[in-house]
Amino acid sequence: MDIVGGQNLRQMWDDLAGMYGDKTALIFESCEGIVRQFSYASLNEEINRTANLFYYLGIRKGDRVALHLDNCPEFIFCWFGLAKIGAIMVPINARLLGEESAWILQNSQVSLLVTSAQFYPMYREIRQDNSTPLNHICLIGEQLPADDGVSHFSQLQARQSATLCYTPALSTDDTAEILFTSGTTSRPKGVVITHYNLRFAGYYSAWQIALRDDDVYMTVMPAFHIDCQCTAAMPAFSAGSTFVLLEKYSARAFWDQVRKYQATVTECIPMMIRTLMVQPATPTDRQHHLREVMFYLNLSAQEKDAFTERFGVRLLTSYGMTETIVGIIGDRPGDKRRWPSIGRVGFSYEAEIRDDQNRPLPAGEIGEICIKGIPGKTIFKEYYMQPEATARALEPEGWLHTGDSGYQDEDGYFYFVDRRCNMIKRGGENVSCVELENIISAHPKIQDIVVVGIKDAIRDEAIKAFIVLNEGETLSEAEFFSFCENNMAKFKVPSFMEIRTDLPRNCSGKIIKKNLK
């Protein structure tokens, strides 16, 4: 079944502008509360001007351009402006530092970068090192340096025509993006995403949440992340909805923003839910228009129940990763939701639980979650310039090895156990970090928790818990270990605990465990 029908991203925006015209497409709110708004017609014009800007700077079909930006309308302009001329976006996590960013530039052979003034000093050093192909920087901001090889994005973009001047032949098989994975355990890999992938993501995710053109989809997820792009922006635009993009997350402001924009759909990660729950309760907590809150792993049953009861919302669970493009397993329209299940497989996909010999397992047995899709269409095409890594993850028949552990029940509902790399081998027993984290997070003094395995000469690995306490709380080792012993099997009780003020996280809220070992 081909639901894309040969429509590339250039055709998508031309069609949307013609169909929805003056209807609001994008609302952006900065940290300072400044709001910028664009209709479908005006947003398409901004995209065309940006495409013409890239052409003016020498970018042609197949060229790669990096974006190092926080959430802003210019990210949207660049993303689709590059796609319209067949060029390739390489988004860079805005939290990365110089060495990490330079590594991505080098590995994707990027010569042009779009970034903001705050990141310019880092890239000036990278250019001076001559360690990457980077030779031109286009800066977004007001007060910009007059350095060689630097241009002013807004000034140049404003001079461009609103009509596209370069229209090379495009195919839905063309690469639209190289998105580097978060690399929480190793160097990131460049996930190759096609025009078809993005168009399919729009239709699929809109189906998953039954999105309509009168919906308002609000997100604070970073635009350089697959979630914002394929679970929020693409479905919102594909359905003709209004997409509300917030610059950054504020626990104090978020629920007011939900009400302010009359959002009907939003998305939350566990960190957001936990920080929202520590805000003072108000009589207006349940006064909103939300019908769905997209949710991504992991949350304890107590946390989930407390959140849904206080705010009067329901969570729509979705499971996926950069390589799957969308949430390929999740709560489906019309399905009964079966917490803590991550849902059932979505349309066009197959899913199996497999053992270490790559054989399918029956219901109830834990193994690796494997997904079957079509490379370059419903799942990623390949890892950029890494054929061996591609071959390890992706079978010729389209089966993707996720590296995650889970099981399914007799009714086809799937359950996530843990990232396979997060399973701790302790004296012959396999211990799930997520299971322990969910148990320990129920302690009333604990705000945040992560469990890791550390080397142990006798038992292979020992278990260590890193803890963030609620403000003003204290917790002794004796109290902590007593709680664990009363709530889990003896072999699962951590050997060590460490109290910290915070935990290292990447852009999507995932804890960077390699920084804790």
Curated annotation (Swiss-Prot):
Its EC number is 6.2.1.48. PANTHER family: ACYL-COA SYNTHETASE, MEDIUM-CHAIN ACYL-COA LIGASE ACSF2, MITOCHONDRIAL. Keywords: Ligase. The lineage of its organism: Bacteria, Pseudomonadati, Pseudomonadota, Gammaproteobacteria, Enterobacterales. It is an enzyme of class 6 (ligase). Catalyzes the transfer of CoA to carnitine, generating the initial carnitinyl-CoA needed for the CaiB reaction cycle. Also has activity toward crotonobetaine and gamma-butyrobetaine. Pathway: Amine and polyamine metabolism; carnitine metabolism. It catalyses: 4-(trimethylamino)butanoate + ATP + CoA = 4-(trimethylamino)butanoyl-CoA + AMP + diphosphate; crotonobetaine + ATP + CoA = crotonobetainyl-CoA + AMP + diphosphate; (R)-carnitine + ATP + CoA = (R)-carnitinyl-CoA + AMP + diphosphate. NCBIfam families: PRK08008.1. One of its GO terms (biological process) is fatty acid metabolic process. HAMAP family: CaiC. InterPro entries: AMP-bd_C (IPR025110), AMP-bd_C_sf (IPR045851), AMP-binding_CS (IPR020845), AMP-dep_synth/lig_dom (IPR000873), ANL_N_sf (IPR042099), CaiC (IPR023456). Belongs to the ATP-dependent AMP-binding enzyme family. This is Crotonobetaine/carnitine--CoA ligase. CDD domains: FACL_DitJ_like (cd05934). One of its GO terms (molecular function) is crotonobetaine-CoA ligase activity.
